[in-house]
Each structure stands twice: as C-alpha cells, then as structure tokens.
C-alpha cells in the first residue's frame, strides 16, 4: 500500500479541504482518466482496491498511473479510552481530494474497456467520479 517512506513529523493537524483542484485536473499521461467530482479523502486501502480492480479488468493490457498519493496521516485513539492524554497514534494515510482531481489514468486499451475498468474502480471509492478522455491538443 502507498504511504510516505518517512515524514518530518509523525502527526498532522486535521485542516480543511477547500477549493477545487487547480493542479492534476486534466489527463496528462494516459488517454483516459477517472476524475473525482466530490470533495473528500481517499485512504491508501481504497486507492489500492481500485487499482486492483482496474488491473484485473484490463488483464495484461495497458499502463495505469495513480495520480494521487496518500501523504496525510490520520490518527485515532483506541476504543474505550478517556478523552485527553494527548493525540492518538497515526493509523492510516489519506489523500485529500478536491473536485476535479484526476485519480487514475490509463493508456493502451480501448475506450470501452477503460470505461468498464474505471466503473469497477469507482465502486471501490467513496467519492463520485466521472470518466474523462484526453483532449486533443492538450
């Protein structure tokens, strides 16, 4: 699963996920992409599950790019522990997603196969997504 090799600080503040994606909002590497239209978080497990769904559907064909990386640690406290006594330990990593962000790209497969692969992947993700194709001249 994806996670940073090392971080300067183990824990991070919650922050706010605002605005729309100004970077990573167009198909750059492949011919087709899966674009998020919702705001939210994708965990490393969700990204990996979606990647497996795409890989299994296209079999050996095509090349897949993951355009997001889960670099934000989310900490939780154990069950039935009283409040206070500091912040909990990092449990998993998430990628913050703004509307318009391309999550996956694929090349080397027909459009119908790519569309079906992304439909299967979208079922693994908690956000609404749409299928996009590379714009000519872009």
Swiss-Prot record:
Query: Where is the segment annotated Disordered?
Result: 1-22
UniProt cross-references to PROSITE patterns, sorted A to Z = RIBOSOMAL_L16_1
Q: Where are the transmembrane segments?
A: none
Q: Which Gene3D superfamilies match?
A: Ribosomal protein L10e/L16
Q: Does the keyword Ribonucleoprotein apply?
A: yes
Name a single GO biological process: translation
Quaternary structure, per UniProt, is: Part of the 50S ribosomal subunit.
Known function:
Binds 23S rRNA and is also seen to make contacts with the A and possibly P site tRNAs.
Molecular function as annotated in GO: rRNA binding; structural constituent of ribosome; tRNA binding
Bias (Basic residues) occurs at 1-13
Q: Which UniProt keywords apply?
A: Ribonucleoprotein, Ribosomal protein, RNA-binding, rRNA-binding, tRNA-binding
Query: Into which family does the record put it?
Result: Belongs to the universal ribosomal protein uL16 family.
Q: Which domain of life is it from?
A: Bacteria
UniProt-listed Pfam families:
Ribosomal_L16
Q: Which organism is it from?
A: Variovorax paradoxus (strain S110)
Its recorded name reads: Large ribosomal subunit protein uL16
Q: Tell me if Transport is a UniProt keyword of this record.
A: no
Q: Name one GO cellular component term.
A: cytosolic large ribosomal subunit
Q: Which CDD domains match?
A: Ribosomal_L16_L10e
